[in-house]
């Protein structure tokens, strides 16, 4: 997920991860991300997984969300060059959502009002995106310079399927953008979900406790599900061994600060220097929390088991999160999801900073 710069005076101290971490043996992960950049939440989440010990990132698949996929591919390739991770392939993915399009979203905006964030459909001048509006296939000049490496000559859905079949029941799928690529993989291969080790998603919103008007006024709205509701619906109905959901509710309990960036920059590693040079985004740690919680589940102190889906009706709630308990769920194939509710904030910040200091 995104996003936008907000400052905070919150300070934390970075200390090394405990030797008794859950990262005791190599774990395999596929990263599916809307990798807008440079730096920012999307890139920091990828760095958390890339820099984690005992973790192998099999590849990074790109999907439009915060920005258009062609631009995201270039930002992510360049990030991997600057942080010395060029052994990890970047795979082009879906440019457009399955059904929702820009014209329909503009029409809904005129009828139901404006959302604070439109990602690839938004505009920096209006505060609804991180970059000026541009056409999907246009890649503006990159602040961090253009990459010299190339993306893999394969599409995201087939790459995801191939990797899961190569490592049956060993690969976690980490999805922190709209779920278009994951939905396409599920439609191409009925075994894709069941052959994985599980799914980690940054998405959805249940009942965030906040005065932030973006979520206080629309408590079930969240950008990743909203951008491609049909994809989220497909993914949430698939037979995953386990689904962990990092929602708005828990994400807004975190905050990236200038003090954190100062601590990260003091490491003078390639990752730290990349973030020090290009990070100007001080906001909630959405995607980073989903990544670190997968690396160390102990930072999640409370979760709720809920059945989760997405509203597909064409009205003001199109793309909103739907939830049920076991006694109230519909008979439509919804799956049980581990919905994260609360965290050990200090432990999360320590591990996050250590991972950003990287190598």
How would you label these PLM feature ranges?
Residues 25-27, 44-57, 223-359:
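Conformational coupling and interaction surfaces
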Residues 1-12:
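Bacterial N-terminal signal peptides that target proteins for export
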Residues 25-86, 101, 128-245, 251:
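Active-site histidine-anchored catalytic micro-motif
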Residues 107-126:
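A charged helix-plus-loop insertion that forms the helical arch/lid used to bind
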Residues 20-24:
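Sec/Tat signal peptide C-region and signal peptidase I cleavage site
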Residues 89-97:
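A short, structured active-site edge motif that brings together acidic residues
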Residues 104-113, 213-217, 260:
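Short, surface-exposed amphipathic charged segments that create phosphate/polyanion-binding patches used
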């Amino acid at each position: 997920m995104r996003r936008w710069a907000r400052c905070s005076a919150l300070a934390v101290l970075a200390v090394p991860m405990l030797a008794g971490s859950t990262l005791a043996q190599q774990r395999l992960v596929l990263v599916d991300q809307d990798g807008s950049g440079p730096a920012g939440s999307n890139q920091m989440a990828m760095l958390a997984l890339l820099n984690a010990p005992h973790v192998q990132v099999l590849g990074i698949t790109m999907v439009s969300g915060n920005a258009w996929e062609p631009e995201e591919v270039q930002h992510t390739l360049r990030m991997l060059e600057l942080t010395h991770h060029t052994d990890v392939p970047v795979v082009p993915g879906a440019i457009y959502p399955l059904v929702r399009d820009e014209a329909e979203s503009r029409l809904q905006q005129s009828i139901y009002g404006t959302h604070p964030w439109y990602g690839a459909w938004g505009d920096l001048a209006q505060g609804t995106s991180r970059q000026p509006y541009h056409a999907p296939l246009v890649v503006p000049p990159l602040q961090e310079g253009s990459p010299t490496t190339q993306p893999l000559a394969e599409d995201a859905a087939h790459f995801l399927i191939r990797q899961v079949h190569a490592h049956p029941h060993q690969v976690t799928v980490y999805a922190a953008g709209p779920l278009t690529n994951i939905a396409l993989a599920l439609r191409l291969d009925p075994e894709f979900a069941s052959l994985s080790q599980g799914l980690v998603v940054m998405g959805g919103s249940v009942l965030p406790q906040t005065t932030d008007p973006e979520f206080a006024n629309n408590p079930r709205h969240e950008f990743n599900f909203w951008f491609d509701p049909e994809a989220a619906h497909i993914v949430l109905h698939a037979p995953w061994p386990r689904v962990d959901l990092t929602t708005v509710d828990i994400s807004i309990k975190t905050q990236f600060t200038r003090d954190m960036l100062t601590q990260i920059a003091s490491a003078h590693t390639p990752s730290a220097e990349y973030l020090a040079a290009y990070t100007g985004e001080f906001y909630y740690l959405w995607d980073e929390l989903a990544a670190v919680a997968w690396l160390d589940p102990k930072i999640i102190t409370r979760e709720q088991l809920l059945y989760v889906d997405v509203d597909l009706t064409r009205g003001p709630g199109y793309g909103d999160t739907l939830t049920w308990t076991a006694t109230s769920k519909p008979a439509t194939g919804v799956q049980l999801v581990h919905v994260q509710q609360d965290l050990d904030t200090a432990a999360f910040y320590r591990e996050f900073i250590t991972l950003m200091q990287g190598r």
